[in-house]
Structure formats: C-alpha cells, structure tokens
C-alpha cells in the first residue's frame, strides 16, 4: 500500500511539472509572434527605403539622359566644304580640294570623339584614369587642328575665288575662239581634254590628248547628225592626227578657219 501511495505521489509531481512546462511554453509563444511581427516591420521599412533609393536612381538616370540628349545635337555641327563642280577644277585644284576634304573629315572625327568623351562622363567614370593619357593627346591634337582651321578657311575662300576666275576665263575663250573645254581626265597616257569648237559651219566635238611632247586629236563625229559639217571640213580633221606642242597654235588656227569658211 505504501508503495502505491509513493507511486501516486510521484505521478502527481510529474503531472504538475508537465503542466508547468506547458504553461511556460504557452507564455513564450506570443513573445515569439511579437518578435516575428517586428522582423516583418523591419523588412517592410527596408522595402520602403529601397523603393525611395530606386526612385532617386531613376531621377538621376533621367537627368543624365537629359544631359546626353542636349549634348548629342553638338555632334551634328560639323565643318563642310562648299558645293563645287569638280569638272570645273584643274587637276592641281582638284588635288588641293581633296586634301582639304580629308583634313576637314579628320577635324570632324576629332570633334566627335571630344564630344562623346564629354558626354560619357555623367554616365560612368570607370576606366577614366587608364584612358587619361590618350584623351589628353587627342585633345592636344584637336587644339592644333583648330588652330589650323583659320588658315584652312582662308584657303577655301581662295579656292572659291579661283573657281570663279577660271569660269570667267572659260567664258572669254569661248567668246573669242569658240572653244569650250567640258572636262579634263588624267590617265597614264597624259591629260585628256574633251572639247568642242563652234563656228559658222557648226560645232565640232573632239578629244585632245596631251602628253609630254605631243597632242593627239580625235574627232567625235556622227555620220547622221554631222553630215553637213563633214562636207565642209578638210580631210585631216575627219581622222585622228598627232602633232607637237609647237604646232598647237597652228592647228588651232586651222580648226577655227575650217569651221568659219
């Protein structure tokens, strides 16, 4: 009997201990929930802060985009040569014109690089130190090109004046001698002038090839359209002939006489 009572007492103690542990566990649960809720509040606040930072970044990007767009219009401001008919230029003038054109293209390329380098600064400065020497060299070269720009403009003005003068000279030659030079082509044989002379009998089109010593005359006659003219021309003007530079004035006089008589 005593053993049974002792066993019952122990069972009661164990039950009381179990109840105490359960009560402690129940009291702990709300605190754990409270801590979870506070963690969620911290996460929510972090989310709001991140949203504000993202909005600020968007505003920064928009400002950078505005700066870049305003600068891009500068890329369209480039030096340009005046429109010139190359056929009106002599061989030397055409070479000078092409050299000026190359120089202007180089200036425009350097200016474009300079502008793009400036526009890239608001976007990122990564690697700027590594390229600093190259940029400085290019800026120095650009400054030198700008200094030469003034003399380049003067050369362009002179070229335009020369073109006007040559046009006036061609008008004078046409009025006095009836000679027009359409163009000049340089090849391995020399200079080929495409010409035409006009007189009372009509207009004769021909090509003159000038090499180091001689002229080569090649008429360009059409049997159908130039039939009447061919009747009045001497035979030597109906075929290819070669004569020296010294004989050039004599040939010109005979050609004009044949077209007038």
Curated annotation (Swiss-Prot):
**Gene Ontology cellular-component terms listed:** chromosome, centromeric core domain; chromosome, centromeric region; cytosol; kinetochore; mitotic spindle; monopolin complex; nucleolus; nucleus
Q: Where in the cell is it found?
A: Nucleus, Nucleolus; Chromosome, Centromere
Q: Which GO terms describe its biological process?
A: attachment of mitotic spindle microtubules to kinetochore; cell division; meiotic sister chromatid segregation; mitotic chromosome centromere condensation; mitotic sister chromatid segregation
List GO molecular-function terms, semicolon-separated: microtubule site clamp
User: Pfam families per the record?
Assistant: Csm1 (PF12539)
**Record field: compositional bias (Basic and acidic residues):** 10-19
Protein name as it appears in the record: Monopolin complex subunit pcs1
Regions of compositional bias (Basic residues) in chain numbering? 21-34
> What quaternary arrangement does the UniProt entry report?
Component of a monopolin-like complex composed of pcs1 and mde4. The complex associates with the kinetochore.
Q: Where is this region: Disordered?
A: 1-42
Keywords from the named record: Cell cycle, Cell division, Centromere, Chromosome, Coiled coil, Meiosis, Mitosis, Nucleus
Q: Which InterPro entries match?
A: Csm1/Pcs1, Csm1/Pcs1_C, Csm1/Pcs1_C_sf
* Residues in coiled coil: 91-170
Instruction: Outline what the protein does.
Output: The monopolin-like pcs1/mde4 complex is essential for accurate chromosome segregation during mitosis and meiosis II. May clamp together microtubule binding sites on the same kinetochore, preventing merotelic attachment of microtubules. In contrast to its S.cerevisiae ortholog CSM1, is not required ofr mono-orientation during meiosis I.
The uppermost taxa in this organism's lineage are: Eukaryota, Fungi, Dikarya, Ascomycota, Taphrinomycotina
